[in-house]
C-alpha cells in the first residue's frame, strides 16, 4: 500500500465526513447571514461570516472537483455525481455534466491550447476566459431567479446579495489564482513534467486556507488525481518541493 493510500472504507467514511462538514458549515453560515445576522449592529461578526462563506465556497467547489475524480465516494460514480451536482448548485448553480467534461479535458491537455482552463494572456484575460468557460446562459438565467426568490422571501434585507453571490465571486477568484493561474502559468518556473503544473511553495496552513491544498500541492494532484484534497500532503515525498 502506498504512503498516500487508505483502505477504501476508511477513505469513503473520511471523505463523506469532511465533505459533509464543509457543506453543513456553509449552510449554517448562509442561513445565519440571510435570516438572523444584523450586520449593522455586529459588523465584526458580519465580516467573519462573509470571510467564512468565501472560504467555504471554495470548499464547495473543491468537493465537486473531488467528486469529478471519484474520490468523495470511491467506486460509486452516481453518488459522486449526485454530491458534485449538489455542491455546484449551492456554489453558483453550475452544471455537473459541463463541469466534469471540461475538467477531464484540462487534465488531458493541461497548459496547452486544448486545455479549457488555460490562456496565454495575462491574469485578467485568463480569469475572464476561465469564468466564461463555465458560466453560460444557463447560469446567467438561474442566478437572477434565485436572487429574486430570496428578495421575495427576505424583503428589503440586502444580505442575500452580499452573502451569496459575492462570496461565490471572490471564491472563484481565489480558485483561479491559487488553483489555476499560479500552478499553470508559463514562463515562471520550469514545469517538472508533461503535466505543465507546479506546486506553490507555501506552508500547509496557507495551502489549506488559499485553495484546500490545490495550490501547495497542484503538481501532486496531477500526478495522483484520485487522491482527495485532504490527503494531498501525504503524496509528496520527503524533500520534494515540485
From Swiss-Prot:
<protein>
    <recommendedName>
        <fullName>Beta-carotene ketolase</fullName>
        <ecNumber>1.14.99.63</ecNumber>
    </recommendedName>
</protein>
<keyword id="KW-0125">Carotenoid biosynthesis</keyword>
<dbReference type="InterPro" id="IPR005804">
    <property type="entry name" value="FA_desaturase_dom"/>
</dbReference>
<dbReference type="GO" id="GO:0016491">
    <property type="term" value="F:oxidoreductase activity"/>
</dbReference>
<keyword id="KW-0560">Oxidoreductase</keyword>
<comment type="function">
    <text>Converts beta-carotene to canthaxanthin via echinenone.</text>
</comment>
<dbReference type="GO" id="GO:0016117">
    <property type="term" value="P:carotenoid biosynthetic process"/>
</dbReference>
<dbReference type="Pfam" id="PF00487">
    <property type="entry name" value="FA_desaturase"/>
</dbReference>
<comment type="pathway">
    <text>Carotenoid biosynthesis; astaxanthin biosynthesis.</text>
</comment>
Amino acid at each position: 500500500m502506498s504512503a498516500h493510500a487508505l483502505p477504501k472504507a476508511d477513505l469513503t467514511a473520511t471523505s463523506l465526513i469532511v465533505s459533509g462538514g464543509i457543506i453543513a458549515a456553509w449552510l449554517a453560515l448562509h442561513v445565519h447571514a440571510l435570516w438572523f445576522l444584523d450586520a449593522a449592529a455586529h459588523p465584526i461578526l458580519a465580516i467573519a461570516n462573509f470571510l467564512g462563506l468565501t472560504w467555504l465556497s471554495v470548499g464547495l467547489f473543491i468537493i465537486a472537483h473531488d467528486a469529478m475524480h471519484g474520490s468523495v465516494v470511491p467506486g460509486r460514480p452516481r453518488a459522486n455525481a449526485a454530491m458534485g451536482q449538489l455542491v455546484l448548485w449551492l456554489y453558483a448553480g453550475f452544471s455537473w455534466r459541463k463541469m466534469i467534461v471540461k475538467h477531464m479535458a484540462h487534465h488531458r491537455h493541461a497548459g496547452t491550447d486544448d486545455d479549457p482552463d488555460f490562456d496565454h494572456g495575462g491574469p485578467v484575460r485568463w480569469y475572464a476566459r476561465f469564468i466564461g468557460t463555465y458560466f453560460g446562459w444557463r447560469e446567467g438565467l438561474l442566478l437572477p431567479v434565485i436572487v429574486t426568490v430570496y428578495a421575495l422571501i427576505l424583503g428589503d434585507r440586502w444580505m442575500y446579495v452580499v452573502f451569496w453571490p459575492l462570496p461565490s465571486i471572490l471564491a472563484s477568484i481565489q480558485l483561479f489564482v491559487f488553483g489555476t493561474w499560479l500552478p499553470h502559468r508559463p514562463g515562471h518556473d520550469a514545469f517538472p513534467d508533461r503535466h505543465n503544473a507546479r506546486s506553490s511553495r507555501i506552508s500547509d496552513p496557507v495551502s489549506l486556507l488559499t485553495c484546500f491544498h490545490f495550490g501547495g500541492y497542484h503538481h501532486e494532484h496531477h500526478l495522483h488525481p484520485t487522491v482527495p484534497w485532504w490527503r494531498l500532503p501525504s503524496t509528496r515525498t520527503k524533500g520534494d518541493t515540485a
